Amino acid sequence: MDGSSFLDISLDLNTNPFSAKLPKKEVSVLASTHLKRKWLEQDESASELREELNRVNSENKKLTEMLARVCESYNELHNHLEKLQSRQSPEIEQTDIPIKKRKQDPDEFLGFPIGLSSGKTENSSSNEDHHHHHQQHEQKNQLLSCKRPVTDSFNKAKVSTVYVPTETSDTSLTVKDGFQWRKYGQKVTRDNPSPRAYFRCSFAPSCPVKKKVQRSAEDPSLLVATYEGTHNHLGPNASEGDATSQGGSSTVTLDLVNGCHRLALEKNERDNTMQEVLIQQMASSLTKDSKFTAALAAAISGRLMEQSRT
């Protein structure tokens, strides 16, 4: 029997159907979708990073602007404080403020609120009210001065001046008298091109003594030191009355200064005497005026009538 005569009874069945490979088109589609998904995820993360970066940049810009405003405000406040400190101390602590002299009316010497102009009498109620208010103010000041301790008024009333020789090239305005002083201001006055320095005694916390030092306008080789008040503590050498100034080999004590101070007191006494003479001459000339005496008599009679009514 011939082999070609046998029949092929094989069914050609595929026992592993999943082992077949996918077509190339399907593989490319899957790869592209996977890449697109990754790209989308990367784009989302990149956009989030960009938003975060923009937010941080805006916050940084705001903080920079705030810092610039704070620095500007600080500089303005600092400059304002320096201006206040430079002009506040000399203006507040200065005691010798020049007072403008005015011509006093004749009635001010006599104490009556009478206004005279070209021989005419002007007796108004406003002047009487002003005089009454002035009297009340004086009584109030007297009561307050009585309540104050005697030491306080004594400290304010005591003023002494010391003249210290120094070199004209020295601009320190320092007078060494043994005490410790704290400088709180300096100012240029009208009557002297040299500045005036203001000091406060720091030897004791509660010491009220103040010192003003300025070069003399008449003699630039002298320093004029003015002391106001009395020390409430012992001095460095247990003697408060000594005011010694040492500048190189030159020493000036109060014995030297008292002479200059005495001359100043004598000058003030002469000025007061001259003022009294002028007042007496003015009073005598006014009493000779018949119109003035008539106005004065009318004012006195009016005042007496008012007092009798009350």
UniProtKB/Swiss-Prot annotation:
Source domain of life is: Eukaryota
Keyword Nucleus among UniProt keywords: yes
Please spell out the taxonomic lineage of the organism that makes this protein. Eukaryota, Viridiplantae, Streptophyta, Embryophyta, Tracheophyta
Supply the induction statement. By salicylic acid and pathogens.
Entry similarity comment = Belongs to the WRKY group II-a family.
Q: What else is known?
A: Constitutive expression at high level causes severe abnormality in plant growth.
Cellular compartment(s): Nucleus
Report the InterPro entries cross-referenced here: WRKY_dom (IPR003657), WRKY_dom_sf (IPR036576), WRKY_plant (IPR044810)
Q: Which Pfam families match?
A: WRKY (PF03106)
What GO terms are given for molecular function?
A: DNA-binding transcription factor activity; identical protein binding; sequence-specific DNA binding
Q: What is this protein called?
A: WRKY transcription factor 18
